UniProtKB/Swiss-Prot annotation:
Note: This lambda chain expresses the c7 allotypic specificity.
Organism per entry: Oryctolagus cuniculus
Keywords, in A-Z order: Disulfide bond, Immunoglobulin domain
Disulfide bonds: C27-C86
Name of the protein: Ig lambda chain C region
Residues annotated as domain Ig-like: 6-100
Cross-referenced InterPro entries: Ig-like_dom, Ig-like_dom_sf, Ig-like_fold, Ig_C1-set, MHC/Immunoglobulin
Protein origin, superkingdom: Eukaryota
Length: 105
């Protein structure tokens, strides 16, 4: 089975959650093969390791894999950044998706 680069979607925190001073970003990684994938979160270009929770890849019905990565921030942290990026590395290929908090409020 040939290698397949993942599709990456980055979801912003919900407005409901922000009211509670919480901000969870969800990076959805799907349709990749083989199953080994590395996720790196960046805020304003700097690597973030605190508050990161990444699932083990699971097999989809099409025999490719999917995983999710969550970044837990406070609403104030989220609003203080210019941009937040989910960087996914798979088989030497890197896919990046970014959000600008100012555009998501």
């Amino acid at each position: 089975q040939p290698a397949v680069t993942p599709s990456v979607i980055l979801f912003p925190p919900s407005s409901e959650e922000l009211k509670d001073n919480k901000a969870t970003l969800v990076c959805l990684i799907s349709d990749f093969y083989p199953r080994t994938v590395k996720v790196n979160w960046k805020a304003d270009g700097n690597s973030v390791t605190q508050g990161v929770d990444t699932t083990q890849p699971s097999k989809q019905s099409n025999n490719k894999y999917a995983a999710s990565s969550f970044l837990h921030l406070t609403a104030n942290q989220w609003k203080s950044y210019q941009s937040v990026t989910c960087q996914v590395t798979h088989e030497g290929h890197t896919v990046e998706k970014s959000l600008a908090p100012a555009e998501c409020s």
